[in-house]
Amino acid sequence: IHYSITDAGGDSPNVVQPRAQVLYMVRSIWVKDALELQERVDRIALAASMMTDTKMEKKFIDGCSNTVPNKVLESLMWENFNDLGVCHYTEEELKYAKALYDSVEMKSADLPGDAAKDSDEIYEFVDEKSKHGTVPINEFLVPYLYSEKPRMGSTDVGDVSWCVPTAQINTSTFPAQAPGHSWQNVSCGRTSIAHKNMLLAGKVIAATAIDLMEKPEVLQAAKDEFNKKMKRYGGYICPIPKDAVPVVLGEKM
């Protein structure tokens, strides 16, 4: 549970303000668990208002689901990625990536990429290619490894994956060791490093789409895998209430 007090009601520390506003973000590995936790948070807020004889109002902002992987589509995307090859960089781009890499004061001891944590073979591969995690930006493709292990993050692609077979890839749009949500990541957004990797991702997606149109048996296999998982997981539960309306973040209630 994350929270931010967006409006304390006033500046005076010795006064009980007439109103206050707080933003909560409730997260879990499975969307159904997040929704149950959200209901509990709502009940706690209501109970607190009853204890203080105040009025509680709530406004839903947004929500997204966990992502359901599809091995058939992921394998196909990896094959196309492997055929197209990874991006390579100019001396100027490598110099820029190195400067950002060096600016990260607290570097992680982990190797780049989640898969290195799940497979000894991939760990050794990444360790060699990244020179023990010291390469500023990666220029290699990690071997494919199917995994249902949860990865932390939030994306509306998760909701799509509950409705149709879905797969994703990652390209090197920012330097290694740059923490998520960091200024180092943001600093790469308008660079040629990010642009060429975005174009590469588009090519991989396009090539995969062509394969699915030309190979209906592969598309059917992806659908079969999707249907089996939906039967196992119980189908899609939309985290957004039917009466929800768009909200401007930070807007006073």
Please describe what each predicted stretch is.
Residues I1-D114:
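Midchain, well-structured core segments that form catalytic/ion-binding scaffolds
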Residues C64-M253:
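An extended, acidic, His-containing surface patch that forms the Zn2+-binding/catalytic region
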